[in-house]
Every structure is written in C-alpha cells, then in structure tokens.
C-alpha cells in the first residue's frame, strides 16, 4: 500500500482500509482528500444563510442543520459496500467542489438590477386568443392525472431561490414557460419555474442537498428516459419540486433570448412556435378543455409580444399557412411543401419515428445534421433541397387521408423553429402562420396518430439510499 493514500482513506473511512477497500478506492483518493479538507463550518454557515433567505418559513434550528451535515459527512464510516462508498464519494465530491459557486453565492449581495421590465397590455388581442382557444376545444376531458401535477409544498421556496439563481447564472441558465410570460405580463400565473441550463445535474444535486440539510427529508432526482436530458427533483412524498432540461453550451448560445431584470427568457417567438406545436398533442388539447383561461392569457401574451416586436399585421391574410402536408400512413412520414417560402429547402419530410429518421440520415451518408436538443425535440438535416426532421407529438386527422389543421400548423411551426434558431428568413412565414389563427374552423378529430414510444429505464439519484443510476 502507498502510505499517503492509505492515510487519506483511513482519515475518510474512520478506520484502516481493508485490502479490497484500498485497491478499489485508491483511484478516488484525490476526491476523497477534497472531502477530508472541506471546511464544514463555512459550509454550514452558507446553509444557514440559504435557509434564512429562501426557506425562512420552515422550522429548522441551526443545530439541526449542523447535525444533518456532520451526519452525512461521516456516513462512509459505517458503510462497507464498495458500491455505496463510490456513490457517497461522488455525491460528496460534487457538493464540496460546486455548492459555493452554484448555490452558496446566492447568499451574497448580487449585482445591481438594470430594470428592463417590458409589460404588455393584452386587452386588444385577448379576444383573438379566446377565439383561437375555443376553436381548439374539440376533445373530451380525460381523468388521467399527470405526475407533475402533484406539486410539493416546497415549490414556493424553490421559486424564490430560482429567481435569484436565474439572475446570478444567466449565462448558463434561462427560463421559459409561464414564469417567463409572468415577467412580460404580471397577470400570467405560474407554478414552478421552467428552466434550460448547461449544468442541470450538478445544480439539482446541490439543491437536493440544500433541501435535505434544511428539512431533514430525503429528496430524489429522477431521469426520465422518454425526455432527452430531463431531470426532475421530487420530495419525500414523491411530489414535484422542480425539473430542468440540460442543454449544451452551443445550444444555449443559439437560442434567441431577451433580458428582463437581469433574467434571460427564451424569445417569446420561439415559445409561440413551441405552443403551436404542443396544440397537436392530444392530452394538451384535453388540458385546454379543463382550463381554457390559463391558455388564453398565455397565448395572448405571446401573440402581443410577437405582433409588436416582429411587426405582424393581423389582417387574416395567411398566405400558404399552414403549409400543405400529406401523410403516409405506412411509413409514418409527413411530406410538407415548403417551396413557397424563402427557405434553404423545397420540401420537408417529417418523421413520426425518431429511430427511422436516424436510420435514413445514416443511409444518406450526411453528417451535417443540427440538433437543438430539447428546444426543438429533434435534429434537422437539409440534404438535396429536402429537410429531414422528427415530430415528437401526436398527429390529428380530420379524415382518413387529411391532416387536421391544428397538426398542419404544428408541423409548420416546427419547421419555423429551425428558421428562427438558424437566423433564417422568418417574417413572411411568421406573419402567415399567426394570421392563420384568425377565424379557425372548429373541426372534430377523426383519428389520432400516436407518437412513437420511447423505451428505457428511469435513472435515479437517491442521497439517502446511496444510489446513482445516471
């Protein structure tokens, strides 16, 4: 045995390492030494400040926090499973090397906020948004309860923390969804804060530890296999606290965004296209029937922003939108005619099965596909004047061979996402797709073409049980 390494392991384990422990853990001695020399007093002080600033309503004494921290950092002393020791080392290493920069910094005085608040009065466009939403109320309500609807009592505290986090880390974390619209229109209500960031795993692990040390409760991180790079944090009752999509830094830099009070939000034009896409998802149409007012105010806010900032004239002239689309039932591929716009492609093949798209791209021997990850939920490839891409939502039919207008518009919006993200020509097709929303024909759904089934196992990080499977 190397005496220096053995001493580091002995100091960490509180016992002299067995031969098996030495040989399996010696590769981790640098990380273990970081844990050994970690200043727990300063860390406990940061936790107390975090608790005072963001969780002041929770009953927890300073001695409770200290006891919880010291108990966790001595956990390895009574652990003999090599697998569990590896998990403890990994989680402790993340905590001691990242917490101060990720969450601890939120307790210090932040930079001055440069007020850039832009409030939008939606009164003039709310009638249009109401008509649009009512035209989409064409489904019956399902009794199915989605898991994320079970909201933790900690959401309010975490939201307060997230507002500060978004300001401090606005180069690698941005928000979208209802909170971002609330910043544009205070009448928009929000639940949790939807975020995209480049270090989701580290952030959520640090947040899980913060909650554990303050509340004493075990929280669990889940990775969902059918959502790319998505993680959700759940409390001890399996209730939703916060979720996050992880994206690459180059994707972050590609996303158009606007700054409001030091917080970056995804440009509402991108969010509007994503909303039009989502309307093609059958369970989202069911949500509209349950609570149309919620969708109306969000849609109106997006429409008003885009109308003003992109100079859209609402006159009902929708040109070629939604674009002509035909569906091949056997191949599960939609062909979209795009040659009427100034796009770098003349037509588009929309695949409903992602694996089939990947296979066909491979056969094309083309290596210039671009993937915007969760922003578009698909890669895009342009080859020989044809775009190849994947559509992740259900497709609605109005007859056996005719795609419902809600879905043709959703497909068109998916194509416009590419144009927006690549800074291509957008004004005319954007004007057309928005004007196509005026005087929508309310049409029943003949059939729903299901989206492809994603397989895989949930990953989990459980601090209490020393489990990491992703």
UniProtKB/Swiss-Prot annotation:
Entry's Gene Ontology BP terms: mRNA processing
Residues forming the catalytic site: 192, 194
Entry-linked InterPro entries: PolyA_pol_cat_Poxvir, PolyA_pol_cat_sf, PolyA_pol_nucTrfase_Poxvir, PolyA_pol_nucTrfase_sf_Poxvir, Poxvirus_polyA_pol_cat_C, Poxvirus_polyA_pol_cat_N, Poxvirus_polyA_pol_cat_N_sf
EC top class named in words: transferase
Keywords associated with the record: ATP-binding, mRNA processing, Nucleotide-binding, Transcription, Transferase
Catalyzed reactions per annotation: RNA(n) + ATP = RNA(n)-3'-adenine ribonucleotide + diphosphate
Enzyme Commission numbers on file: 2.7.7.19
MF annotations from Gene Ontology: ATP binding; poly(A) RNA polymerase activity
Family: Belongs to the poxviridae poly(A) polymerase catalytic subunit family.
Function, in words: Polymerase that creates the 3'-poly(A) tail of mRNA's.
Quaternary structure, from the entry: Heterodimer of a large (catalytic) subunit and a small (regulatory) subunit.
Listed name of the protein: Poly(A) polymerase catalytic subunit
Encoding gene per record: PAPL
């Amino acid at each position: 045995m190397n005496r220096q390494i053995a001493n580091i392991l002995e100091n960490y384990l509180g016992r002299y390492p067995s031969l098996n422990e030495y040989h399996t853990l010696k590769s981790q001695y640098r990380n273990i030494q970081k844990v050994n020399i970690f200043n727990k007093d300063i860390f406990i002080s940061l936790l107390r400040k975090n608790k005072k600033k963001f969780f002041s309503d929770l009953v927890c004494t300073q001695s409770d926090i200290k006891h919880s921290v010291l108990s966790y950092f001595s956990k390895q002393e009574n652990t003999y499973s090599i697998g569990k020791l590896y998990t403890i080392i990994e989680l402790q290493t993340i905590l001691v090397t990242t917490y101060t920069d990720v969450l601890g910094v939120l307790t210090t005085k932040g930079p001055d906020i440069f007020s850039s608040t832009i409030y939008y009065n939606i009164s003039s466009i709310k009638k249009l948004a109401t008509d649009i939403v009512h035209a989409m109320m064409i489904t019956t309500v399902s009794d199915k309860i989605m898991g994320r609807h079970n909201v933790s009592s900690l959401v309010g505290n975490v939201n307060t923390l997230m507002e500060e986090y978004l300001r401090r880390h606005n180069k690698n974390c941005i928000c979208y969804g209802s909170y971002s619209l609330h910043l544009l229109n205070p009448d928009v209500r929000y639940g949790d804060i939807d975020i995209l960031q480049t270090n989701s795993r580290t952030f959520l692990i640090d947040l899980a530890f913060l909650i554990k040390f303050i509340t004493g409760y075990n929280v669990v991180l889940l990775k969902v296999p059918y959502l790319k790079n998505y993680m959700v944090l759940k409390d001890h009752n399996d209730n939703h606290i916060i979720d996050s999509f992880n994206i690459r830094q180059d994707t972050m830099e590609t996303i158009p965004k606007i700054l409001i009070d030091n917080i970056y939000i995804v440009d509402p034009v991108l969010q509007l296209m994503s909303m039009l896409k989502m309307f093609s998802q059958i369970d989202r149409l069911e949500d509209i029937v349950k609570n149309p007012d919620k969708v109306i105010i969000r849609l109106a806010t997006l429409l008003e922003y885009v109308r003003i900032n992109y100079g859209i004239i609402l006159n009902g002239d929708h040109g070629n939108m939604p674009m002509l689309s035909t569906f091949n039932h056997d191949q599960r591929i939609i062909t979209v005619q795009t040659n009427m716009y100034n796009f770098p492609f003349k037509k588009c093949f929309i695949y409903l099965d992602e694996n089939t798209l990947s296979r066909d791209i491979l056969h094309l021997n083309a290596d210039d596909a671009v993937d915007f990850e969760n922003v578009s939920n698909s890669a895009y490839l342009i080859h020989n004047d044809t775009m190849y891409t994947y559509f992740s939502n259900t497709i609605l039919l109005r007859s056996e061979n005719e795609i419902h207008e809600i879905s043709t518009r959703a497909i068109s919006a998916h194509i416009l996402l590419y144009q927006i993200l690549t800074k291509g020509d957008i004004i005319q097709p954007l004007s057309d797709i928005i004007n196509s929303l005026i005087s929508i024909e309310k049409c029943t759904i003949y059939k729903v073409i299901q989206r492809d089934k994603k397989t895989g196992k949930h990953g989990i990080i459980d601090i209490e049980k020393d489990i990491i499977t992703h």
